[in-house]
Structures are given as structure tokens and as C-alpha cells.
């Protein structure tokens, strides 16, 4: 299975389709900037939140392949306090916050503020294999986002103090584990693309971009990226999982939920997190057996399979497992995430 499909050239850029808001909308969405001292730039951050009627309805993540999810841009926030979930996206087609709207929007509807930075280099016109492979900078993006949201006047009086969690999908799952305390092994990262056996799609892009992981400065890759403000982490089909220093898992002190997509024994090694879950003292592990890695993408539009065939796209981005639709799999993942973050952030210890 290929993990990150680098097909951005054929994908219509994310569109925000404006319509008058209606009283039935309950989720707001807002953009802000987060200063990143690590990267020397400001990060674009998308925030979903429980909202009152108002603003304009927008469709986030809509493209010629994928169905968008509606929210109300700049709607007034509901007058209450909410836990905060930091959301980390993957790379390629899932390489932006809007691609995660299918899970962010219902979590906001469940009473969470969800904030997702755009990790630089992962997709779009500024796509960069070198930046994408600097996995150790991604947790710092979440840390910068947390600081920015806590300081933002629009949100700061609506956040429950000390109630912060991290959620990541695919490469974002790697990020969620890292901010919980997992450390990258620089030697394993350097050797990750020595073969195509681990991640053919990603590593082909890395090589075509002229990036030699052995030649990169990976000295900072093994640092501790944990943020003590994070109380809980959830990783859905995290990848790569096989570049971590296994000894670091024992030092993770917060609860961690890990979900793999696929049947045990059929999950590719780079995403199989069953072993690392056993190495953590407070981890729980589950699988969604009739799903695939591509199930974390938004629902495909009816014409998407034809586009995939005509463009000779090698990755079956619209294929799931067996028996259920993507919408049904999404409903299960949303329920799992909502239950996990409610337990971790809405229940007093």
C-alpha cells in the first residue's frame, strides 16, 4: 500500500463556497496565525468551535475528488468554556487542515474547540519533500498553535484551563505520539527511504525531489518534543511508526489511544502501531478492520473514481476495506474520537 499520494497537481485547490448561514448551523470556523520560532514563519491555523448562528456557511475540503464539510465562517462562539483539541493533518492529499474537516466539524459539534495548523511543505504550491520529512518540527507546530489559541482574544475566555488534547491522522498520528513524548531515532529516519518497502509513494517523491535523508541535518530529530500542557493524545493510523526510538515510549506519561485502520496482520509495518502501544504504560489500542489507510480521507465524489482511472493514479484513494461505506467508517471514527476526548478532557480526574 502506498501511503501519501502526491497528486496535488490534478486536484483542484480547496474551495470555500459561500452561502448565507442558517439557524441550523452549529459549528464555526475561523483562521488565525501562530508565530513559529522553530520555522521562522507564521503558521496558518484553522479553528473549529461550537457556534451561535451567524457568519457565512463555507464548505471546507471540497475538491474535484472529495466532498467538503460545512461550517460557519467567523460565527459568534457559543458562550461557554470548552476543551481544546490540537489536530495534526497528514501529507499529500490529506496535507492540510481542511482535509480533516470531516472529523473536526463533528468534534466541535460535540463541544470541543479544534485547532489545526498547516504543517509547511506537506501539500500545495509550496510542497517540499525536505520540509515534510522534518518530522520533529511538526510537534512544535502544535505547541505554537496552542500558545496562539490561548492568547487569541476570540477564544481565550472560552477555553477550559488544563483541558488540552492532541489528535493526529497518518503523519499527523506520528506528530500526536511525538508531542506526547515519543522521540524519533535519527538513524532510522535517515534510512527510511533506502528501500520502497516501507512507503513507496512517499519515498518516490523524496527521491524525485533530490532529497537525501542521509545528507540532511538530523541531529535535532531525536529531541524530546513533548508539551506538558497536553493531557491526552490520540493517533489514527499513525505513520511512520517505525522511525521512533522504542525506549522513548516508556517515558510517555499521559494516556494515549491508538487506532489502526485494517485487519491485524494486514496493516503495513510502517503504520502498524500494535507493538508500540504495548510499550506505553497508559495506551489503548484498537483496529477498524474493514477500513484502509485511505479511509481517513474525506468521502469521494461520484466522479472521483473516473478521475483516478483517467489520470492513472496508482493509489486507490477512494477504496476502503470490505463491507462498509466511508461515511459509515467515518461515523465510527468520529464516535471513537468523541468518546476518547470526552473521557480524557471532560471528566474530572
Sequence positions of predicted segments:
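Domain-level recognition of soluble alpha/beta enzyme cores
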Residues: 24-87, 109, 304
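Short substrate-entry loop that stabilizes the transition state in hydrolases
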Residues: 67-70, 74-82, 87-127, 265-268
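Alpha/beta-hydrolase active-site loop
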Residues: 131-157, 161, 190-206, 210, ...
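Short glycine-enriched nucleophile-adjacent loop
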Residues: 147-150, 173-185
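Conserved alpha/beta-hydrolase "acid-adjacent" motif
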Residues: 244, 265-272
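Short beta-strand/loop motif that positions the catalytic acidic residue
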Residues: 252, 258-260
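Catalytic active-site module of serine/aspartate enzymes centered on a nucleophile-bearing elbow/loop
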Residues: 302-349
Amino acid at each position: 500500500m502506498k501511503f501519501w499520494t502526491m497528486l496535488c497537481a490534478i486536484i483542484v485547490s480547496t474551495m470555500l463556497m459561500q452561502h448565507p448561514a442558517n439557524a441550523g448551523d452549529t459549528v464555526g470556523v475561523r483562521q488565525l496565525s501562530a508565530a513559529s520560532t522553530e520555522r521562522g514563519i507564521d503558521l496558518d491555523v484553522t479553528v473549529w468551535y461550537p457556534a451561535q448562528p451567524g457568519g457565512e456557511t463555507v464548505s471546507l475540503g471540497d475538491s474535484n475528488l472529495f466532498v467538503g464539510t460545512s461550517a460557519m465562517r467567523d460565527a459568534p462562539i457559543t458562550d461557554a468554556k470548552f476543551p481544546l483539541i490540537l489536530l495534526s493533518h497528514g501529507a499529500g492529499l490529506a496535507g492540510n487542515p481542511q482535509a480533516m474537516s470531516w472529523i473536526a466539524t463533528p468534534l466541535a459539534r460535540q463541544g470541543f474547540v479544534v485547532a489545526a495548523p498547516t504543517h509547511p511543505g506537506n501539500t500545495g504550491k509550496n510542497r517540499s519533500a525536505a520540509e515534510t520529512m522534518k518530522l520533529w518540527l511538526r510537534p512544535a507546530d502544535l505547541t505554537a498553535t496552542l500558545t496562539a489559541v490561548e492568547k487569541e482574544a476570540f477564544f481565550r475566555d472560552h477555553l477550559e484551563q488544563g483541558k488540552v488534547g492532541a489528535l493526529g491522522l497518518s503523519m499527523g498520528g506520528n506528530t500526536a505520539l511525538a508531542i506526547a513524548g515519543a522521540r524519533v531515532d535519527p538513524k532510522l529516519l535517515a534510512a527510511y527511504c533506502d528501500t520502497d518497502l516501507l512507503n513507496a509513494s512517499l519515498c518516490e517523491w523524496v527521491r524525485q525531489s533530490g532529497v537525501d535523508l542521509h545528507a540532511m541535518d538530523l541531529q535535532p530529530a531525536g529531541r524530546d518534543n513533548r508539551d506538558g500542557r497536553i493531557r491526552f493524545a490520540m493517533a489514527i493510523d499513525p505513520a511512520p511508526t517505525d522511525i521512533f526510538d522504542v525506549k522513548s515510549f516508556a517515558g510517555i506519561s499521559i494516556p494515549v489511544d491508538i487506532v489502526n485502520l485494517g485487519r491485524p496482520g494486514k496493516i503495513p509495518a510502517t503504520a502498524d502501531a500494535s507493538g508500540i502501544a504495548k510499550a506505553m504504560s497508559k495506551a489503548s489500542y484498537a483496529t477498524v478492520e474493514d477500513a484502509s489507510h485511505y479511509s481517513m480521507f474525506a468521502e469521494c465524489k461520484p466522479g472521483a473514481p473516473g478521475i483516478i482511472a483517467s489520470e492513472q493514479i496508482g493509489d486507490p484513494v477512494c477504496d476502503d476495506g470490505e463491507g462498509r461505506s466511508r461515511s459509515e467508517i467515518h461515523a465510527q471514527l468520529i464516535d471513537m474520537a468523541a468518546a476518547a476526548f470526552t473521557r480524557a478532557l471532560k471528566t474530572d480526574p
